[in-house]
């Protein structure tokens, strides 16, 4: 696998990293995200409908205001077990330096146990474009216009 093109400052908040658990890393050459682990002291069971903030065991500092990080669910956990993020997506601003917490929600029908070290989410770094607002009275017409939910149909 080719080496990363940029570096990310990471604080290890859990001593099990490097010993019991590897650092977050890209699993394949084309992976967009690095898996985040549940830095729990003991197994945690989420009953259907329960939500919990789970520590990732790391803190990051992007420093570059043209970047952000997002915490996203792992597709298999959501599809097979109903384990998703309680906040949909976790947005991490470039100047945030605190611990990464994973809002985890069991939207499934069965209890699900998360073990210490389980990979429960993924971290993706994205570019940011900051826009200035231009107040207008009307927009130039577009093909879609103001068509909202369901506007383009399903077929």
Swiss-Prot record:
One of its GO terms (biological process) is dUTP catabolic process. Its EC number is 3.6.1.23. Keywords: Hydrolase, Magnesium, Metal-binding, Nucleotide metabolism. Substrate binds at residues 74-76, 87, 91-93. Pathway: Pyrimidine metabolism; dUMP biosynthesis; dUMP from dCTP (dUTP route): step 2/2. Belongs to the dUTPase family. PANTHER family: DEOXYURIDINE 5'-TRIPHOSPHATE NUCLEOTIDOHYDROLASE. This is Deoxyuridine 5'-triphosphate nucleotidohydrolase. It comes from Xanthomonas euvesicatoria pv. vesicatoria (strain 85-10).
């Amino acid at each position: 696998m080719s080496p990363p093109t940029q570096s990310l400052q990471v604080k290890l908040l859990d001593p099990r990293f490097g010993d019991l658990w590897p650092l977050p890393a890209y699993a394949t050459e084309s992976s967009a995200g690095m898996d985040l682990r549940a830095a729990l002291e003991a197994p945690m069971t989420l009953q259907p409908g329960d939500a919990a903030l789970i520590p990732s065991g790391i803190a990051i500092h992007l420093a570059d205001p043209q970047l952000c990080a997002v915490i996203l669910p792992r597709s298999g956990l959501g599809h097979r077990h109903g384990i998703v993020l309680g906040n949909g997506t976790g947005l991490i601003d470039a100047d945030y330096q605190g611990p990464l917490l994973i809002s985890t929600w069991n939207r499934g029908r069965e209890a699900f146990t998360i073990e210490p070290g389980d990979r429960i989410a993924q971290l993706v770094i994205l570019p940011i474009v900051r826009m200035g607002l231009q107040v207008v009275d009307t927009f130039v017409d577009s093909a879609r216009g103001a068509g909202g939910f369901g506007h383009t149909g399903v077929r």
